């Protein structure tokens, strides 16, 4: 929005630079001068890099501003000058670092007498530090030429900014070779020894504190950088000097030989604690996932331990007689004799020394009875948790290292204080073998001389009495509980168990009984209370079924998964509510695999026709054969193309009045029926009586039971009234007559010619059928021009055994015309193509609310009601009676490309036959007359009084009559 409304202000720096006599102060008054400088405005950089401007910038950060200036703007220009000099612009850095006159002007800041202005000192340190990082060689060369540089820095070490500058020289010099040269230069200047000298009671507290902090940082930086280097370089000379025994002894001498001040004792002890920092070993003797070099770099040098050991008595005296402190007011009252920072650091040093597990130091501490003194302080200063923690660490170190000694003794190996250091120049402390140690000296001392068990019991009982009297619970009870638990754990298990058990058994009887009662009752109850979770860990019920998350705080991936599950659940619910179907529309739930196809849509219609139509007999004669069920077991092969030999039979009435039965010649066409269709083909070829129509009243072959699921898609045509009905879902074999290639003598054939017929009510320009049967049967129509008989141009009518309705969404189409002459009929007729035929369209419905599924196969001949296009024909047996009723099961599919379902040639003088009754599923009847075309559409059929899917009755198309030509 800021840029949208063009609120950005234009910089005035360029305008000022266009002036002839612009000053640096005028430019620094602009707020965007830093942005322009970092953007490397060349005109501005050229102005700033002038000698006069550079000198003015350096003077601003090294000279105190006038005192008469207002305080809030007094250091404005020095701050801006420092930012300009350290903005990491190469042009400015090169100009400042490459000019010794500017460096000398900058260096003169150190010649001021202490104390330095802290703010100006920070500007100076930042500028020099930036030059050390950017122009290392030039700056280091310049500083080496200054003999008093280290002395001046140490002179102003009380200013923290100068301490930072010294650390930059130690850590920020690159590459490693140049850094090593700088370290050697600093070591030659005796930086470590001079810093140690600053830790003296005669020095200011700030100088002592900063000198101590500098030494601690040098130790840590030296160890860290030494461990991070892959190649084995020479050791850090500064770290080696600081870890030397002479340096440690000098430090301790400065601490204790003069007037003992708390600041000196604390500062010196901090350096010793840093030198004693070690890599802690895990409870199972495993180190954490750091490199081996890092472990070695944190090892304690034996020279440090040798330097500290003679001064243990001084630290013991420090714990007894610390520097005097005044009484202080605390939240629990006035503390007359505070513990003091010096004694606290002394306790920290004892814990660090015990952690090294040096036998000589352990023996000296036992001789001095230092642990007993620490326990006295523990129970005296009940509210000093810093002290309580250090005493707990001391006891834990004694017990854990005693166990380590036992493990070493059992393995017969020698226990070392530390692994070898990577430097190789510092020898490591090699303690005596654990086997030669006198019976775990520190453990025995802790339980016998220090009376740890008795002190725990006495303090616990005293606290119970205090609380019973209405007093406060003591502040050290938490640490006392942890100490007691450590004793019990080492008593119950571990290598030190035997030794502690002997010590406990050596206690007086009353004390031993109190301890056992304390462990079994009091301590157990306390631990039970302490282990109660402050926050309930009971997991709330989640809508997700994933119950594998056991942590109270699941990780990020688990949270994301739970949120995703929640979103999916909400989205699914909304989707079903908004875009789903109503349950009442699909009340029947089929277990069949094809059930989803039943729920799409359906077309239900009935056709009323004249009961005297003779077409019912011919329709029944063609449809009486049972249809092969769809085999669901071969779903994986339904899309594979294969060849099959199909035959179609059409019943027509030629011009001379004798009915003929014609069989189609074998043709190659696509079949998608799979293995089952091939087997059926072979069976029909081998069956006797091929090509013979079924005798009237004759019972068909025994039914073949199909798969229960496959039977759901079978098409059943009921037998005539005199035949035995068959249960739905059972398919009967109709013989192989329809599959056998007929070889009858050529006869004269008469073909129906529809050129004079009127088209159906709907044109072919309507929407194309979306049924899969349309696609499947397109191959059948294409095969008309591929056979050996070029004249077979008739449209096919196919009935699929698994199709409930092929015209579920298509509109009424024109009936394709069937034309034949002497050339196409093989010489059967010469000029008899004007014979008109009656065509009945088979339209099948699946029932209310259903739509035909996609058909995977091209219908076989036994499922076909009629198919035209064969050269051979035979006389139809006149004894075949006309059926009274035709019932079509919902499995007949009619390809839109071959819309002619049944072509029946009727004689104009033919007798009237009663019209068959209309079945609930389908009733197709052709009235008396030359022709009546029946077709199906989603909402219209070409018959009088047709019932559409919408449940409405549409009027017949114009020109249509019940008993007359269309």
Swiss-Prot record:
It comes from the Eukaryota. InterPro entries: ARM-like, ARM-type_fold, SAPS. Signal peptide: none annotated. Ubiquitously expressed with strongest expression in the testis followed by liver, heart, kidney, brain and placenta. Keywords: Cytoplasm, Phosphoprotein. Pfam families: SAPS. Disulfide bonds: none annotated. Residues 408-436, 657-707, 819-856 are annotated as: Disordered. The keyword Cytoplasm applies. The keyword Phosphoprotein applies. It is found in: Cytoplasm. The modification Phosphoserine is found at residues 289, 771, 828. GO terms for cellular component: cytoplasmic ribonucleoprotein granule; cytosol; nucleus. One of its GO terms (molecular function) is protein phosphatase binding. GO terms for biological process: regulation of signal transduction. Residues 408-424, 669-687 have a biased composition (Basic and acidic residues). Belongs to the SAPS family. Regulatory subunit of protein phosphatase 6 (PP6). May function as a scaffolding PP6 subunit. Involved in the PP6-mediated dephosphorylation of NFKBIE opposing its degradation in response to TNF-alpha. Protein phosphatase 6 (PP6) holoenzyme is proposed to be a heterotrimeric complex formed by the catalytic subunit, a SAPS domain-containing subunit (PP6R) and an ankyrin repeat-domain containing regulatory subunit (ARS). Interacts with PPP6C and NFKBIE. Interacts with ANKRD28. This is Serine/threonine-protein phosphatase 6 regulatory subunit 2. The lineage of its organism: Eukaryota, Metazoa, Chordata, Craniata, Vertebrata. The gene is PPP6R2.
